[in-house]
A protein has these predicted regions:
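N-terminal secretory signal peptides that target proteins for export/translocation
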Residues: 1-13
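Short linear proline/tyrosine/threonine-rich motifs used for host-factor recruitment
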Residues: 248, 253-255, 261
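Bacterial N-terminal signal peptides
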Residues: 17-29
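Right-handed parallel beta-helix/beta-solenoid
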Residues: 36-37, 93-142
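Short glycine/acidic-rich loop motifs that flank beta-strands on beta-rich extracellular proteins
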Residues: 62, 67-70, 74, 155-157, ...
Length: 647
């Protein structure tokens, strides 16, 4: 060092002197706030307070920050208990390696419930009153928002929701959520909240054992429904609301005298009017700020979500691809009374496992940008509609998703008129996409809904070891047009590829069972499929089928049992190019005339499969023929049979 200084002093003596003077000043100066330190707070601190980067803050009795703006980076906080240490505070910078509780931010765990009568006004003739318990308590919105701000930009934090914390529902439709931005390695656990979470650009986040509820205890509610007709002058809806003193501004009904605003938008658009249905909005909303990275590795485990519009939602903006999330894990959670979807995904590499749901409109939505998602052991009852995979029009980025070991029961408990109801809706996908349905059970029981079957519109689907039970008694098509009652089918189709050529799907069915309960007539069992390969498939029940295959380009079925008496195996006019397979049994309705369309080469197929009712021919009468008129006799008719066909 002496050599270096000597050489430097010989070349730049003035500069060396200045540097040495500056170093001496720093060494001799007293400690300042820019140095990392252990800070003990033993009094009430207000105003703005800057904590040296990397410092540790501890608290003594009576010590806290109040109405304070606190700044600092990588600050560690040791609260020394659960009392309030941040009272109405805001934060700038970041905190790390700290463990706190909700009450440290001034939240008061006094939420309880009182009996209440909840009134739903969802239309001119729909009024429902439910006896419920309404939550009440201290409004902890500001305190919990402060907790979220503390977590933002933080690293390795643990937050305990140590109690039940009430928050007033924001009736103007804001997210009403604890907002956390750009945090990493944060764990939040326990307790009950009326406020959900909104995470932007967060990484390695864990939520454990949290209950997120709505304004009231869980109870069945009528889905809010509207269409454009209700806003037309003179409509029943228009007369109803105007007679009650409301006017419509294009978005909601407003009472000028009271200021009450009632928005009847349903499903995607329910933003305002949450108080009308007693719901909170998303329990967990996960996305990305365009200026930061996507949210990744979010774990939600052992949580319960009730009376919300949505449960867990990963958000994506189609116009900004970096607004995506990835690697979401939702396990051991329960969802009930969810207005729309417990699971709504716009993200990739998701794992949903061991979850249950009840009274939900649609249990699982793998929507735009949802790909490589596994939903395993998800059991849902009282669903309005079945799960789906879907994309924005023109996009191919929802692909390679799977439902495994799941069960979905679709009933009339949640019903909206004029809506198409699918057991499963799978749409879009890439050219190499394969949607998988494995070891699942579906049931559809309705006297109201327009059953649309399994709508599979992706490029390829594999369905294995699954069962589908269909009980449709009073079909939508008859209810809409009484003039055709008794003529229209209960079910238009069971499996439908839907698309026009050449976008129709390739579908593989292996060990799949379709059971018709109260359903009496199916028009087409398999409809508009490019290539259908079926092995060990059973179609059985109480009904009949007009056709088993219609507009299915190539059919290869083996060891299947088609037990519904049909009028045709392949519909007349179908564009089927080939039908192959062996070891199948087809039951055929008496009086059926043409089982295959003209021109389809089906001789080998007819030879290698058993086609007919499997009923034995009636025994011949031993009695002598009798005649009703002289010279004419009545002879018992003999059934037309062959070695393979039995009518």
């Amino acid at each position: 060092m002496h050599t270096i200084i000597t050489a430097f002093s010989q070349r730049r003596p003035a500069r060396l002197a200045a540097c040495l003077a500056a170093v001496a000043a720093l060494l001799l100066a007293p400690a300042t706030g820019v140095q990392a330190a252990t800070i003990v707070v033993d009094r009430v601190i207000t105003g703005s307070y800057s904590i040296p980067d990397g410092s540790t803050v501890t608290f003594k009795a009576g010590g806290k920050f109040k109405n304070c703006r606190i700044s600092g980076a990588r600050v560690r906080v040791v609260p020394g208990g659960t009392r309030t240490i941040f009272d109405n505070c805001t934060f700038a910078g970041s905190f790390s390696n700290s463990e706190l509780s909700a009450t440290n931010f001034g939240a008061v765990p006094d939420m309880d419930s009182v009996p209440s009568t909840w009134t739903y006004r969802t239309g001119p003739s729909t009024v429902m009153r439910a006896s419920v318990y309404r939550y009440r308590g201290t409004d902890n919105g500001a305190a919990l928002a402060s907790m979220g701000a503390f977590c933002s930009n933080g690293v390795n934090l643990t937050l305990h929701i140590n109690g039940k914390f009430y928050t007033r529902i924001n009736q103007q439709g804001s997210h009403n959520a604890i907002a956390i931005d750009n945090a990493e390695g944060v764990t939040i656990e326990g307790g009950t909240l009326l406020m959900g979470f909104k995470m932007w650009s967060c990484r390695r986040m864990t939520f454990k054992g949290i209950s997120i509820v709505g304004e009231t205890t869980a109870h069945d509610f009528p889905p809010i429904y509207y269409n454009a007709d209700q806003y037309k002058a003179g409509s029943a809806w228009d007369k109803f609301w105007r007679a009650a003193g409301y006017t419509h501004d294009g978005e909601a009904w407003t009472n000028a005298a009271t200021g009450e605003r009632i928005d009847l938008k349903y499903l995607y658009n329910i933003k305002r009017g949450l108080s009308l249905v007693g719901l909170g909005n998303e329990a967990f909303l996960i996305g990305a700020n365009p200026h930061y990275l996507p949210s990744t590795d979010i774990t939600i485990d052992g949580c319960r979500v009730s009376m919300r519009t949505l449960g867990v939602m990963t958000a994506a903006d189609p116009s900004a691809h970096n607004w995506r999330a990835t690697r979401l894990s939702v396990t051991n959670c329960h969802f009930d009374h969810i207005y729309y979807q417990p699971i709504a995904l716009h993200s990739g590499y998701n794992h949903i496992a061991h979850c249950t749901a009840d009274y939900v409109f649609q249990p699982v939505d793998m929507s735009t940008y949802a790909h490589n998602t596994l939903v395993d052991d998800f059991k849902a009852t009282r669903c309005g509609i079945g799960p789906k995979q879907e994309n924005h029009s023109g996009s191919d980025e929802s692909h390679d998703n799977e439902l495994r070991n799941c069960s979905f029961a679709i009933t009339d408990d949640i019903y909206l008129p004029d809506v198409m109801y699918e057991m499963l809706w799978v749409r879009q996908g890439r050219a190499d996409d394969c949607f998988k349905l494995t070891n699942c059970k579906f049931s559809f029981t309705s006297t109201k809904k327009w059953f649309r079957g399994l709508m599979i519109l992706t490029h390829k689907a594999i369905v294995s070891n699954c069962q589908f039970t269909i009980n449709v008694k009073d079909p939508y098509v008859r209810a809409k047009d009484p003039a055709i009652s008794g003529q229209a089918p209960d079910v238009n189709w069971i499996v439908n590829g839907y698309n026009a050529e050449p976008q129709r799907p390739d579908i593989t069915l292996d060990n799949v069972r379709f059971v018709l309960g109260t359903t009496s007539r199916v028009q087409d069992v398999f409809f508009k499929i490019k290539n259908l390969k079926a092995t060990a498939v059973t179609v059985e029940g109480n009904g009949t089928a007009d056709n088993y295959f219609d507009h299915t380009r190539a059919i290869d079925v083996n060891k299947c049992r088609f037990d519904l008496p049909c009028q045709a195996i392949v519909a007349a006019g179908s564009n089927t190019a080939s039908v192959t397979g062996t070891g199948n049994t087809f039951k055929v309705a008496r009086g059926a005339k043409s089982l295959f369309p003209a021109g389809l080469k089906s001789q080998a197929f007819e030879r290698d499969n058993t086609i007919g009712s499997q009923a034995t021919a009636p025994a011949r009468s031993k009695a002598k023929p009798t005649s009703s008129k002289p010279g004419r006799s009545r002879v018992p008719q003999r059934a037309v049979t062959s070695s393979k066909w039995h009518f």
